[in-house]
A protein has these predicted regions:
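Short, surface-exposed interaction patches in beta-rich subdomains
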Residues: 78-174
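Right-handed parallel beta-helix
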Residues: 2-4, 8-80, 133-167
């Protein structure tokens, strides 16, 4: 445990670095879930989280930063809420799912897949089958929106996103 974060689990740290608005940690959980708690009042420029090997990572709190980078690799990464100006999501053969706090029309969305699928609000944006059939690239070409979202699947994995639905009542979640 440190003064700027807390960890609950049996974990081994290879590296921890807190430098102003950047926090980096490399850790291994020992056959049990690990929970990392960052201060709520933190004003982060960048948050970068990746799953090693076939790890299973769940983020149960809102991640808020200028830039958010999440990578599921070959594991499973679930994020409850991502709030950032620039969001980059990657999966190889793993699965990444995340909730976005605003409606889809507030994001410039670009998605690519070599074989896997990127889904937003239940609709496939890119989806390739074993024969290479399907759509490999998607760009909603949204301009002058507050958020930039890039989703890439480089293997047979999947990225699934759920955003708020644009409506007259902004408090109604999907």
């Amino acid at each position: 445990n440190g003064s700027d974060f807390a960890v609950s689990a049996s974990v081994n740290f290879a590296d921890t670095q807190i430098n102003g608005t950047h926090w980096t940690a490399s850790l291994w959980a020992n056959d049990e879930p690990a929970t990392i708690t960052l201060p709520r009042d933190g004003n982060y420029l960048q948050i970068r989280i990746s799953c090693g090997q076939q790890a299973n990572v769940t983020i149960r709190d809102r991640l808020s930063a200028q830039n958010i980078e999440l990578s599921a690799g070959n594991g499973t990464l679930t994020a409850d809420e991502l709030y950032g100006h620039r969001i980059t999501l990657d999966a190889t053969d793993g699965r990444l799912s995340a909730t976005l706090p605003e409606s889809a029309d507030q994001y410039h969305v670009r998605a690519t897949a070599n074989w896997g699928t990127v889904i937003m609000n239940g609709t496939p944006l890119v989806q390739m089958d074993e024969l290479g059939n399907g759509t490999a690239q998607y760009d909603n070409r949204a301009e002058h929106v507050p958020h930039d979202l890039q989703a890439r699947v480089s293997g047979s994995g999947q990225i699934s996103l759920l955003s708020q639905i644009a409506s007259t009542n902004a408090d109604t979640p999907v």
